[in-house]
Amino acid sequence: MPYDNVIAITYQGSSLPVVHHRCARGPNVFRHLETTYLTGAYVLDPIYQYHLRRERSGIFRLLDVAPDQFKRSHYYEWYYGLIGITDEISVVQTVGDDTTITVSMGKDRSSAQMFSWLDERRLRRHEAVIMTLLKAHWASGADPLSRQPRGLTITDGLIAAMRDRHSLTLSRRQAEVALLILQGHSSVSIGLNLSISPQTVKVYRKQLYHKCNLSSQAELFALTMPILQQISMLPTGKQRSSVTRAG
């Protein structure tokens, strides 16, 4: 299957992702990987959230696992607009209790194309072989990751940082709603994740925006992104994620 770029990442629990391989045939779409994605933006990534939910292995288009309003989210506009990836197909293989191996193939501005249904079908023909190879590679111990206990959740970290950095006291629900908004969930989707009504979600969002003196998702993103970067830099075992039940 022709692609413009490819990256292999392993996620383990809520530890920082480990990048094993990257290659871009055209523009360097990975130029912001260390400075942006790995310093906190990954927390909002659909593939990372899919990993945390421990859902089935398979081959997925990005929007197959993304929230319902992902392409309208400020994260999508900010990060995907920044790197220039226009389409993505990921091979996702779960191994063990908390580890996910991913290989993501992308299209970017160099080809100005999207993956066709025929591209996807050809890749799926080899799905069983690809998954077997990924599991065998992991079992061989080629890319071991340290296993450490999990501690503070991303939600708790957001609450604590808002208090310490901005003297703002968020309830757990307000913090959960904030994170889900940033991931690209609609009010209906947030309600399904938190088992509350869309109307209640709107109440929490209104409270959140009022408390933080915000008027847009872009302002919420600007306020919370430095905090997510701070949380992501905590030693492993000091942070783990929550709000990860549905896509």
Placement of each model-derived feature along the sequence:
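Non-catalytic regulatory/interaction regions at protein termini and inter-domain linkers
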Residues: L170, S189, V203, A218, ...
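Residue cluster at the C-terminal edge of the helix-turn-helix DNA-binding motif
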Residues: H210-S215, L223, I227-I231
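Pre-recognition alpha-helix immediately N-terminal to the DNA-recognition helix
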Residues: A175-V177, E219
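Short helix-to-turn junction characteristic of helix-turn-helix DNA-binding domains
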Residues: I181-H185, T224
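Recognition helix of helix-turn-helix DNA-binding domains
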Residues: G184-E219
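Regulatory input/activation interfaces that engage signals or partners
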Residues: P2-R109, R122, A128, T132-W138
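Regulatory hinge/linker segments at domain boundaries
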Residues: D143-R173, M233-T236, S241
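Juxtadomain coupling helices with adjacent low-complexity linkers
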Residues: S111-T155
